Amino acid sequence: MHTRKEQMEAFGRFLDVLDELREKCPWDRKQTNESLRPNTIEETYELCDALIKNDAKEICKELGDVLLHVAFYAKIGSEKGDVDMKDVCDRLCEKLIFRHPHVFGEVQADTAEKVTENWEQLKMKEKDGNKMVLSGVPSALPSLIKAYRIQDKARNVGFDWEDRSDIWKKVKEEIGEFEAEVEQMDQDKAEAEFGDVMFSLINAARLYKINPDNALERTNQKFIRRFNYLEEHTIKAGINLKELSLEEMDAIWDEAKKKGL
């Protein structure tokens, strides 16, 4: 891999290129924090896709796209006199050092769980202890990830199940309440109860050290692979997918499962 000097030279070249684009390219010159935000979200998801696929070339490409957005926001900030890339890096270093006293100080933390507990305590100190525990959960997070973060933050202050196996009673209870509302045909109440089912299942995943977002995406990808197999099978046979019966589709689906798709 490259030396630190080579890496810093490449980063400097990147900032020079960005400066020139901001000055000479009509599109880059026109961008604002507001106009870039939707693209930033898209680029972040594209990086996540590459990470899930474990595609090194795509990861490199998408990391570059995300880095471009980070530097672009800093560039816009520097033009306003608010913040530049040095400020961003200095602030980040200060935060990392402050939140890792087990590395840069005398605090002991022998496990990842202990490190996380220390982080939450240190975050409260950063905020002078005046903010609520859940105030640090970004409101713009996707709901599934937000639920996980809410539960994790509550855990860090001791609000958690003493015996993780007890969560299954809660899951069954919530499913029962959801089924009851569905039978009553009350859409609003059924939606609320379904939310409770999801929240309890996400809690179960957390308690058993499963990332629910990763787990769901694995199932998404599995479904896509099997459905693509089904569709490709019908195309090769010259059949329209809609012409197949459910039983015929199930049979092809089972073939895909047997092939490990």
PLM regions and their residue ranges:
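Flexible "arm" and connector segments at domain edges
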Residues: M1-E62, L68-F194, M198-L261
